[in-house]
Protein backbone atom coordinates (compact mmCIF):
# COMPACT_ATOMS: atom_id res chain seq x y z
CA UNK A 1 0.00 0.00 0.00
CA UNK A 2 1.25 3.48 -0.88
CA UNK A 3 1.31 6.06 1.87
CA UNK A 4 -1.04 8.26 -0.17
CA UNK A 5 -3.70 5.57 0.23
CA UNK A 6 -3.53 6.01 4.02
CA UNK A 7 -4.17 9.73 3.78
CA UNK A 8 -7.26 11.28 5.36
CA UNK A 9 -7.97 14.99 5.61
CA UNK A 10 -7.29 16.35 9.07
CA UNK A 11 -4.69 13.85 10.17
CA UNK A 12 -1.23 15.20 10.85
CA UNK A 13 2.02 14.51 12.66
CA UNK A 14 3.78 17.34 14.46
CA UNK A 15 7.54 17.65 13.97
CA UNK A 16 9.48 16.75 17.11
CA UNK A 17 12.82 18.15 16.04
CA UNK A 18 14.12 21.67 16.71
CA UNK A 19 13.83 24.27 13.98
CA UNK A 20 17.07 24.38 12.01
CA UNK A 21 16.70 27.90 10.64
CA UNK A 22 15.61 31.25 11.97
CA UNK A 23 12.08 32.48 11.39
CA UNK A 24 13.53 35.80 10.31
CA UNK A 25 13.99 35.14 6.64
CA UNK A 26 12.01 35.78 3.49
CA UNK A 27 11.75 33.87 0.24
CA UNK A 28 11.39 35.97 -2.92
CA UNK A 29 7.89 35.76 -4.29
CA UNK A 30 8.97 34.15 -7.58
CA UNK A 31 10.30 31.17 -5.60
CA UNK A 32 7.25 30.72 -3.40
CA UNK A 33 4.73 27.94 -4.01
CA UNK A 34 1.40 28.95 -5.50
CA UNK A 35 -0.36 26.00 -3.84
CA UNK A 36 0.43 23.80 -0.82
CA UNK A 37 2.39 20.57 -1.42
CA UNK A 38 0.24 17.49 -1.96
CA UNK A 39 1.54 15.56 1.00
CA UNK A 40 -0.34 12.61 2.52
CA UNK A 41 -2.25 13.46 5.70
CA UNK A 42 -1.25 10.71 8.12
CA UNK A 43 -0.67 10.35 11.83
CA UNK A 44 2.83 9.84 13.18
CA UNK A 45 2.05 6.21 14.03
CA UNK A 46 0.82 5.53 10.50
CA UNK A 47 4.00 7.00 9.05
CA UNK A 48 6.23 5.01 11.41
CA UNK A 49 4.40 1.75 10.71
CA UNK A 50 4.37 2.35 6.97
CA UNK A 51 8.10 2.91 6.63
CA UNK A 52 8.99 0.25 9.19
CA UNK A 53 7.02 -2.30 7.18
CA UNK A 54 8.74 -1.18 3.99
CA UNK A 55 12.15 -1.56 5.64
CA UNK A 56 11.29 -5.14 6.59
CA UNK A 57 10.75 -5.93 2.91
CA UNK A 58 14.26 -4.79 1.99
CA UNK A 59 16.81 -7.34 0.89
CA UNK A 60 20.40 -6.46 1.67
CA UNK A 61 23.83 -7.85 2.43
CA UNK A 62 22.99 -7.39 6.11
CA UNK A 63 20.04 -9.79 5.88
CA UNK A 64 20.87 -12.62 3.47
CA UNK A 65 23.29 -14.14 0.96
CA UNK A 66 23.67 -11.90 -2.09
CA UNK A 67 25.57 -13.74 -4.89
CA UNK A 68 24.95 -11.08 -7.54
CA UNK A 69 27.56 -11.67 -10.23
CA UNK A 70 29.81 -8.82 -11.33
CA UNK A 71 28.69 -6.75 -8.33
CA UNK A 72 30.89 -7.98 -5.43
CA UNK A 73 28.21 -7.70 -2.75
CA UNK A 74 30.56 -7.96 0.20
CA UNK A 75 29.86 -6.91 3.76
CA UNK A 76 30.46 -3.22 4.56
CA UNK A 77 32.32 -3.10 7.91
CA UNK A 78 30.60 -0.79 10.38
CA UNK A 79 33.90 0.38 11.82
CA UNK A 80 34.91 2.16 8.63
CA UNK A 81 31.56 3.97 8.53
CA UNK A 82 32.18 5.21 12.05
CA UNK A 83 35.70 6.38 11.24
CA UNK A 84 34.50 8.23 8.13
CA UNK A 85 31.89 9.99 10.28
CA UNK A 86 34.35 11.62 12.66
CA UNK A 87 33.39 15.28 13.26
CA UNK A 88 36.57 16.58 11.64
CA UNK A 89 35.48 15.00 8.38
CA UNK A 90 31.73 15.44 8.30
CA UNK A 91 31.71 19.00 9.65
CA UNK A 92 34.24 20.31 7.15
CA UNK A 93 32.77 22.71 4.59
CA UNK A 94 33.68 21.93 0.96
CA UNK A 95 35.00 25.49 0.55
CA UNK A 96 37.20 25.37 3.65
CA UNK A 97 40.69 26.76 3.13
CA UNK A 98 43.60 24.38 2.63
CA UNK A 99 45.22 25.40 5.92
CA UNK A 100 41.98 24.48 7.71
CA UNK A 101 41.72 21.08 5.98
CA UNK A 102 45.14 19.53 6.43
CA UNK A 103 43.86 16.32 8.05
CA UNK A 104 41.27 15.81 5.33
CA UNK A 105 43.71 16.60 2.52
CA UNK A 106 46.39 14.36 4.00
CA UNK A 107 43.91 11.48 4.14
CA UNK A 108 42.98 11.91 0.48
CA UNK A 109 46.64 12.23 -0.48
CA UNK A 110 47.39 8.95 1.25
CA UNK A 111 44.41 7.34 -0.47
CA UNK A 112 45.80 8.48 -3.83
CA UNK A 113 49.10 6.82 -2.94
CA UNK A 114 47.42 3.61 -1.76
CA UNK A 115 45.48 3.34 -5.01
CA UNK A 116 48.65 4.04 -6.99
CA UNK A 117 50.42 1.18 -5.21
CA UNK A 118 47.48 -1.21 -5.61
CA UNK A 119 47.05 -0.51 -9.33
CA UNK A 120 50.67 -0.01 -10.36
CA UNK A 121 49.87 3.37 -11.87
CA UNK A 122 51.59 6.61 -10.80
CA UNK A 123 48.70 9.06 -11.28
CA UNK A 124 45.41 9.02 -9.35
CA UNK A 125 42.36 11.29 -9.32
CA UNK A 126 39.64 10.63 -6.75
CA UNK A 127 37.03 13.01 -8.11
CA UNK A 128 34.71 10.75 -10.24
CA UNK A 129 31.45 10.13 -8.37
CA UNK A 130 30.71 6.63 -9.70
CA UNK A 131 32.41 3.81 -11.51
CA UNK A 132 30.61 4.78 -14.70
CA UNK A 133 31.76 8.40 -14.36
CA UNK A 134 35.30 7.20 -13.74
CA UNK A 135 35.02 5.09 -16.87
CA UNK A 136 33.86 8.12 -18.85
CA UNK A 137 36.79 10.12 -17.45
CA UNK A 138 39.24 7.40 -18.47
CA UNK A 139 38.02 7.30 -22.07
CA UNK A 140 37.99 11.12 -22.14
CA UNK A 141 41.66 11.08 -21.12
CA UNK A 142 42.45 8.65 -23.94
CA UNK A 143 40.77 11.03 -26.36
CA UNK A 144 42.59 14.06 -24.93
CA UNK A 145 45.92 12.24 -25.22
CA UNK A 146 45.46 11.45 -28.91
CA UNK A 147 44.14 14.92 -29.71
CA UNK A 148 47.08 16.60 -27.98
CA UNK A 149 49.38 14.67 -30.33
CA UNK A 150 47.36 15.65 -33.39
CA UNK A 151 46.38 12.01 -33.86
CA UNK A 152 42.74 12.79 -34.64
CA UNK A 153 42.21 9.83 -36.99
CA UNK A 154 41.86 7.50 -34.01
CA UNK A 155 38.09 7.27 -33.71
CA UNK A 156 37.57 3.63 -32.68
CA UNK A 157 37.46 1.86 -29.32
CA UNK A 158 37.74 -1.93 -29.31
CA UNK A 159 35.43 -3.67 -26.82
CA UNK A 160 34.88 -7.42 -26.22
CA UNK A 161 31.38 -8.82 -26.69
CA UNK A 162 31.32 -9.86 -23.01
CA UNK A 163 31.98 -6.33 -21.72
CA UNK A 164 29.88 -4.40 -19.24
CA UNK A 165 27.30 -2.21 -20.96
CA UNK A 166 28.89 0.95 -19.59
CA UNK A 167 31.99 0.33 -21.74
CA UNK A 168 30.38 1.03 -25.12
CA UNK A 169 28.27 3.77 -23.54
CA UNK A 170 31.38 5.60 -22.29
CA UNK A 171 33.08 5.22 -25.67
CA UNK A 172 30.09 6.62 -27.56
CA UNK A 173 29.69 9.51 -25.10
CA UNK A 174 33.29 10.48 -25.86
CA UNK A 175 32.62 10.44 -29.60
CA UNK A 176 34.18 7.09 -30.50
CA UNK A 177 32.91 4.32 -32.74
CA UNK A 178 32.64 0.97 -30.94
CA UNK A 179 34.28 -2.02 -32.62
CA UNK A 180 33.25 -5.34 -31.07
CA UNK A 181 35.76 -8.15 -30.52
CA UNK A 182 34.44 -11.70 -30.26
CA UNK A 183 35.13 -14.14 -27.46
CA UNK A 184 36.81 -17.43 -28.38
CA UNK A 185 35.20 -20.75 -27.33
CA UNK A 186 37.64 -21.07 -24.41
CA UNK A 187 36.49 -17.74 -22.93
CA UNK A 188 39.50 -15.66 -23.95
CA UNK A 189 39.44 -12.87 -26.50
CA UNK A 190 39.65 -14.03 -30.11
CA UNK A 191 43.21 -12.90 -30.85
CA UNK A 192 42.90 -13.43 -34.59
CA UNK A 193 39.91 -11.10 -34.72
CA UNK A 194 41.75 -8.55 -32.59
CA UNK A 195 44.69 -8.61 -35.00
CA UNK A 196 42.31 -7.98 -37.91
CA UNK A 197 40.52 -5.07 -36.26
CA UNK A 198 43.30 -3.18 -34.47
CA UNK A 199 44.93 -0.49 -36.58
CA UNK A 200 45.61 3.22 -37.21
CA UNK A 201 42.05 4.16 -36.23
CA UNK A 202 42.32 2.40 -32.85
CA UNK A 203 42.28 4.84 -29.93
CA UNK A 204 42.23 2.07 -27.37
CA UNK A 205 40.70 -1.12 -26.07
CA UNK A 206 38.50 -1.52 -22.98
CA UNK A 207 38.96 -4.73 -21.02
CA UNK A 208 37.87 -6.27 -17.74
CA UNK A 209 40.38 -8.75 -16.36
CA UNK A 210 39.17 -11.14 -15.08
CA UNK A 211 36.39 -10.80 -17.62
CA UNK A 212 32.67 -10.84 -16.92
CA UNK A 213 32.85 -14.56 -17.70
CA UNK A 214 34.80 -14.96 -14.46
CA UNK A 215 37.95 -15.93 -16.39
CA UNK A 216 41.40 -14.39 -16.27
CA UNK A 217 42.51 -13.14 -19.68
CA UNK A 218 45.57 -15.28 -20.24
CA UNK A 219 46.90 -13.43 -23.32
CA UNK A 220 46.80 -9.99 -21.72
CA UNK A 221 50.49 -9.30 -22.41
CA UNK A 222 50.07 -10.13 -26.10
CA UNK A 223 46.90 -8.01 -26.28
CA UNK A 224 48.73 -5.07 -24.70
CA UNK A 225 51.59 -5.44 -27.16
CA UNK A 226 49.25 -5.54 -30.18
CA UNK A 227 47.31 -2.45 -29.12
CA UNK A 228 50.38 -0.44 -28.10
CA UNK A 229 52.20 -1.28 -31.33
CA UNK A 230 49.18 0.06 -33.21
CA UNK A 231 49.37 3.30 -31.21
CA UNK A 232 46.35 2.64 -29.00
CA UNK A 233 45.97 2.62 -25.23
CA UNK A 234 44.54 0.03 -22.83
CA UNK A 235 41.62 0.82 -20.53
CA UNK A 236 41.03 -1.39 -17.48
CA UNK A 237 37.47 -1.69 -16.20
CA UNK A 238 38.08 -2.11 -12.47
CA UNK A 239 34.80 -3.91 -11.79
CA UNK A 240 36.57 -7.21 -11.11
CA UNK A 241 39.64 -5.94 -9.27
CA UNK A 242 38.54 -7.91 -6.19
CA UNK A 243 39.76 -11.08 -7.90
CA UNK A 244 43.38 -9.98 -8.32
CA UNK A 245 43.87 -7.59 -5.40
CA UNK A 246 47.47 -7.87 -4.22
CA UNK A 247 48.23 -10.60 -6.77
CA UNK A 248 48.76 -8.67 -9.98
CA UNK A 249 48.46 -4.98 -10.81
CA UNK A 250 46.72 -3.59 -13.91
CA UNK A 251 49.65 -1.28 -14.58
CA UNK A 252 52.00 -4.26 -14.67
CA UNK A 253 49.72 -5.99 -17.19
CA UNK A 254 50.17 -3.08 -19.60
CA UNK A 255 47.07 -0.99 -18.89
CA UNK A 256 47.32 2.79 -19.26
CA UNK A 257 44.20 3.92 -17.40
CA UNK A 258 41.52 2.40 -15.20
CA UNK A 259 38.73 3.19 -12.80
CA UNK A 260 38.08 1.54 -9.45
CA UNK A 261 34.65 0.61 -8.12
CA UNK A 262 35.00 1.44 -4.44
CA UNK A 263 31.58 -0.08 -3.71
CA UNK A 264 32.86 -3.43 -4.96
CA UNK A 265 36.50 -3.93 -4.10
CA UNK A 266 36.71 -1.58 -1.12
CA UNK A 267 33.42 -2.26 0.64
CA UNK A 268 31.68 1.10 0.41
CA UNK A 269 27.85 0.99 0.29
CA UNK A 270 26.04 -0.18 -2.85
CA UNK A 271 22.96 1.21 -4.48
CA UNK A 272 20.32 3.72 -3.53
CA UNK A 273 21.25 5.94 -6.45
CA UNK A 274 24.43 7.08 -4.70
CA UNK A 275 26.57 8.48 -3.36
CA UNK A 276 29.36 6.60 -5.09
CA UNK A 277 32.98 6.98 -6.10
CA UNK A 278 35.01 5.75 -9.06
CA UNK A 279 38.60 7.00 -8.77
CA UNK A 280 40.79 6.79 -11.86
CA UNK A 281 44.42 5.69 -11.98
CA UNK A 282 46.65 6.42 -14.97
CA UNK A 283 50.06 5.64 -16.40
CA UNK A 284 52.70 8.32 -16.77
CA UNK A 285 51.62 9.50 -20.22
CA UNK A 286 48.06 10.29 -19.08
CA UNK A 287 48.88 12.14 -15.83
CA UNK A 288 48.58 15.60 -17.49
CA UNK A 289 44.96 14.87 -18.45
CA UNK A 290 43.61 13.72 -15.06
CA UNK A 291 40.32 15.28 -13.90
CA UNK A 292 40.59 17.83 -11.10
CA UNK A 293 40.79 18.25 -8.21
CA UNK A 294 43.69 16.13 -7.03
CA UNK A 295 45.69 16.61 -3.85
CA UNK A 296 49.38 17.53 -4.00
CA UNK A 297 52.00 17.71 -1.25
CA UNK A 298 54.42 20.62 -0.94
CA UNK A 299 56.83 21.92 1.70
CA UNK A 300 53.95 23.91 3.19
CA UNK A 301 51.58 20.95 3.50
CA UNK A 302 48.75 19.47 1.45
CA UNK A 303 46.90 21.49 -1.18
CA UNK A 304 44.41 21.20 -4.02
CA UNK A 305 46.16 21.12 -7.40
CA UNK A 306 44.88 23.72 -9.87
CA UNK A 307 44.68 24.24 -13.62
CA UNK A 308 48.15 25.74 -13.44
CA UNK A 309 49.43 22.36 -12.26
CA UNK A 310 47.43 20.44 -14.88
CA UNK A 311 46.76 22.76 -17.85
CA UNK A 312 45.74 19.80 -20.08
CA UNK A 313 43.29 18.33 -17.56
CA UNK A 314 39.96 17.13 -18.94
CA UNK A 315 38.44 19.38 -16.25
CA UNK A 316 36.09 18.84 -13.35
CA UNK A 317 33.49 16.12 -12.96
CA UNK A 318 31.93 17.57 -9.81
CA UNK A 319 31.76 20.87 -7.97
CA UNK A 320 34.05 19.73 -5.16
CA UNK A 321 35.99 16.54 -4.34
CA UNK A 322 33.48 13.98 -5.56
CA UNK A 323 31.79 12.06 -2.76
CA UNK A 324 34.31 12.49 0.03
CA UNK A 325 32.43 10.34 2.54
CA UNK A 326 32.73 7.31 0.26
CA UNK A 327 36.42 7.97 -0.35
CA UNK A 328 37.03 8.10 3.39
CA UNK A 329 35.30 4.74 3.89
CA UNK A 330 37.53 3.14 1.27
CA UNK A 331 40.62 4.68 2.88
CA UNK A 332 39.80 3.26 6.30
CA UNK A 333 38.95 -0.13 4.76
CA UNK A 334 42.44 -0.24 3.23
CA UNK A 335 43.97 0.96 6.49
CA UNK A 336 42.22 -1.70 8.57
CA UNK A 337 43.14 -4.60 6.28
CA UNK A 338 46.62 -3.50 5.27
CA UNK A 339 48.66 -5.03 2.47
CA UNK A 340 48.38 -8.61 3.73
CA UNK A 341 44.68 -8.26 4.44
CA UNK A 342 43.94 -7.00 0.94
CA UNK A 343 45.85 -9.94 -0.48
CA UNK A 344 43.68 -12.31 1.55
CA UNK A 345 40.58 -10.60 0.13
CA UNK A 346 41.39 -11.82 -3.38
CA UNK A 347 42.53 -15.22 -2.10
CA UNK A 348 39.28 -15.91 -0.27
CA UNK A 349 37.15 -14.42 -3.06
CA UNK A 350 38.67 -16.84 -5.58
CA UNK A 351 38.58 -19.71 -3.08
CA UNK A 352 34.86 -19.15 -2.45
CA UNK A 353 34.08 -18.98 -6.16
CA UNK A 354 35.96 -22.14 -7.06
CA UNK A 355 34.58 -24.08 -4.10
CA UNK A 356 31.01 -23.05 -4.92
CA UNK A 357 31.44 -23.87 -8.60
CA UNK A 358 32.75 -27.33 -7.77
CA UNK A 359 29.93 -28.07 -5.32
CA UNK A 360 27.22 -26.89 -7.73
CA UNK A 361 28.52 -29.10 -10.52
CA UNK A 362 28.38 -32.04 -8.09
CA UNK A 363 24.61 -31.57 -7.72
CA UNK A 364 24.00 -31.47 -11.46
CA UNK A 365 24.63 -27.94 -12.70
CA UNK A 366 26.71 -27.19 -15.79
CA UNK A 367 29.63 -24.77 -15.80
CA UNK A 368 29.76 -22.55 -18.87
CA UNK A 369 33.53 -23.03 -19.05
CA UNK A 370 34.23 -26.39 -17.36
CA UNK A 371 37.89 -26.48 -18.41
CA UNK A 372 38.73 -23.11 -16.86
CA UNK A 373 39.43 -22.10 -13.28
CA UNK A 374 37.06 -19.47 -11.93
CA UNK A 375 38.41 -16.16 -10.72
CA UNK A 376 36.06 -14.49 -8.23
CA UNK A 377 32.84 -15.42 -10.04
CA UNK A 378 31.59 -18.02 -12.48
CA UNK A 379 28.78 -18.79 -14.91
CA UNK A 380 26.34 -21.67 -14.87
CA UNK A 381 24.38 -22.36 -18.02
CA UNK A 382 20.88 -23.77 -17.50
CA UNK A 383 20.40 -24.56 -21.17
CA UNK A 384 19.88 -28.28 -20.48
CA UNK A 385 17.36 -27.53 -17.71
CA UNK A 386 15.41 -25.39 -20.16
CA UNK A 387 15.40 -28.13 -22.79
CA UNK A 388 14.61 -30.97 -20.38
CA UNK A 389 12.20 -29.29 -17.94
CA UNK A 390 11.02 -26.17 -19.81
CA UNK A 391 12.24 -23.88 -17.02
CA UNK A 392 14.48 -20.88 -17.58
CA UNK A 393 17.32 -19.19 -15.75
CA UNK A 394 14.82 -16.52 -14.76
CA UNK A 395 12.58 -19.18 -13.20
CA UNK A 396 15.50 -20.45 -11.12
CA UNK A 397 16.36 -16.90 -10.09
CA UNK A 398 12.80 -16.13 -9.00
CA UNK A 399 12.54 -19.37 -7.03
CA UNK A 400 15.72 -18.53 -5.11
CA UNK A 401 13.89 -15.53 -3.64
CA UNK A 402 11.48 -17.87 -1.87
CA UNK A 403 14.43 -19.42 -0.06
CA UNK A 404 15.76 -16.08 1.16
CA UNK A 405 18.62 -15.85 -1.32
CA UNK A 406 19.07 -12.94 -3.69
CA UNK A 407 19.10 -14.05 -7.30
CA UNK A 408 22.42 -14.13 -9.15
CA UNK A 409 22.83 -11.98 -12.23
CA UNK A 410 20.73 -13.48 -15.04
CA UNK A 411 21.26 -13.44 -18.80
CA UNK A 412 24.58 -11.60 -18.58
CA UNK A 413 26.90 -11.91 -20.38
CA UNK A 414 24.53 -12.41 -23.30
CA UNK A 415 26.81 -14.82 -25.16
CA UNK A 416 26.10 -17.63 -22.64
CA UNK A 417 22.56 -19.03 -23.03
CA UNK A 418 20.32 -19.27 -19.94
CA UNK A 419 23.12 -18.17 -17.66
CA UNK A 420 23.47 -17.36 -13.98
CA UNK A 421 26.51 -15.25 -13.08
CA UNK A 422 27.35 -16.08 -9.46
CA UNK A 423 29.80 -14.22 -7.22
CA UNK A 424 30.31 -15.29 -3.58
CA UNK A 425 32.54 -12.57 -2.05
CA UNK A 426 35.29 -13.24 0.46
CA UNK A 427 33.13 -12.25 3.43
CA UNK A 428 30.86 -15.30 3.02
CA UNK A 429 31.55 -18.40 5.16
CA UNK A 430 31.74 -22.00 3.98
CA UNK A 431 28.51 -22.69 5.89
CA UNK A 432 26.72 -20.00 3.87
CA UNK A 433 28.03 -21.43 0.62
CA UNK A 434 26.96 -24.95 1.60
CA UNK A 435 23.48 -23.69 2.44
CA UNK A 436 23.27 -22.07 -1.00
CA UNK A 437 24.29 -25.34 -2.67
CA UNK A 438 21.58 -27.16 -0.72
CA UNK A 439 18.95 -24.69 -1.92
CA UNK A 440 20.13 -24.94 -5.52
CA UNK A 441 19.93 -28.74 -5.28
CA UNK A 442 16.33 -28.54 -4.04
CA UNK A 443 15.34 -26.12 -6.80
CA UNK A 444 16.85 -28.34 -9.48
CA UNK A 445 14.87 -31.29 -8.12
CA UNK A 446 11.72 -29.14 -8.17
CA UNK A 447 12.43 -28.22 -11.79
CA UNK A 448 12.57 -31.88 -12.79
CA UNK A 449 9.43 -32.94 -10.88
CA UNK A 450 7.24 -29.85 -10.40
CA UNK A 451 8.38 -27.20 -12.91
CA UNK A 452 5.25 -25.12 -12.38
CA UNK A 453 6.51 -24.21 -8.91
CA UNK A 454 9.45 -22.43 -10.52
CA UNK A 455 7.38 -20.87 -13.29
CA UNK A 456 5.05 -19.24 -10.75
CA UNK A 457 7.78 -18.13 -8.32
CA UNK A 458 8.21 -16.17 -6.18
CA UNK A 459 5.44 -17.35 -3.88
CA UNK A 460 6.41 -15.57 -0.65
CA UNK A 461 6.90 -11.96 -1.75
CA UNK A 462 4.34 -9.16 -2.10
CA UNK A 463 5.51 -8.38 -5.63
CA UNK A 464 5.60 -11.25 -8.10
CA UNK A 465 6.78 -10.95 -11.70
CA UNK A 466 6.73 -7.49 -13.17
CA UNK A 467 5.99 -6.58 -16.75
CA UNK A 468 9.46 -5.27 -17.52
CA UNK A 469 8.56 -4.02 -20.99
CA UNK A 470 5.53 -2.10 -19.72
CA UNK A 471 7.53 -0.60 -16.86
CA UNK A 472 10.21 0.60 -19.26
CA UNK A 473 7.82 2.03 -21.84
CA UNK A 474 5.14 3.42 -19.52
CA UNK A 475 7.13 4.86 -16.65
CA UNK A 476 4.66 6.08 -14.01
CA UNK A 477 6.17 7.64 -10.90
CA UNK A 478 3.40 10.16 -10.18
CA UNK A 479 0.64 8.88 -7.88
CA UNK A 480 -1.70 11.75 -8.75
CA UNK A 481 -1.45 11.11 -12.49
CA UNK A 482 -3.82 8.15 -12.06
CA UNK A 483 -5.49 8.97 -8.72
CA UNK A 484 -7.06 12.40 -9.15
UniProtKB/Swiss-Prot annotation:
Lineage, broadest ranks: Bacteria, Pseudomonadati, Pseudomonadota, Gammaproteobacteria, Legionellales
Family affiliation: Belongs to the GcvP family. C-terminal subunit subfamily.
Provenance organism: Legionella pneumophila subsp. pneumophila (strain Philadelphia 1 / ATCC 33152 / DSM 7513)
Cofactor(s) the protein needs: pyridoxal 5'-phosphate
Record bears the keyword Ribonucleoprotein: no
Function description: The glycine cleavage system catalyzes the degradation of glycine. The P protein binds the alpha-amino group of glycine through its pyridoxal phosphate cofactor; CO(2) is released and the remaining methylamine moiety is then transferred to the lipoamide cofactor of the H protein.
GO biological process, one term: glycine decarboxylation via glycine cleavage system
GO cellular component: cytosol; glycine cleavage complex
Domain of life of the organism encoding this protein: Bacteria
Subunit record text: The glycine cleavage system is composed of four proteins: P, T, L and H. In this organism, the P 'protein' is a heterodimer of two subunits.
UniProt name for this protein: Probable glycine dehydrogenase (decarboxylating) subunit 2
NCBIfam families given in the database record: PRK04366.1 (NF003346)
Single annotated GO MF: glycine dehydrogenase (decarboxylating) activity
N6-(pyridoxal phosphate)lysine found at: 264
Family matches, as Gene3D superfamilies: 6.20.440.10, Aspartate Aminotransferase, domain 1, Type I PLP-dependent aspartate aminotransferase-like (Major domain)
Catalytic activity of the protein: N(6)-[(R)-lipoyl]-L-lysyl-[glycine-cleavage complex H protein] + glycine + H(+) = N(6)-[(R)-S(8)-aminomethyldihydrolipoyl]-L-lysyl-[glycine-cleavage complex H protein] + CO2
EC annotation from Swiss-Prot or TrEMBL: 1.4.4.2
UniProt-listed Pfam families: Aminotran_5, GcvP2_C
Keywords on record: Oxidoreductase, Pyridoxal phosphate
InterPro entries in UniProt: Aminotrans_V_dom (IPR000192), GcvPB (IPR023012), GDC-P_C (IPR049316), GDC_P (IPR020581), PyrdxlP-dep_Trfase (IPR015424), PyrdxlP-dep_Trfase_major (IPR015421), PyrdxlP-dep_Trfase_small (IPR015422)
Statement: the UniProt record of this protein carries the keyword Oxidoreductase: yes
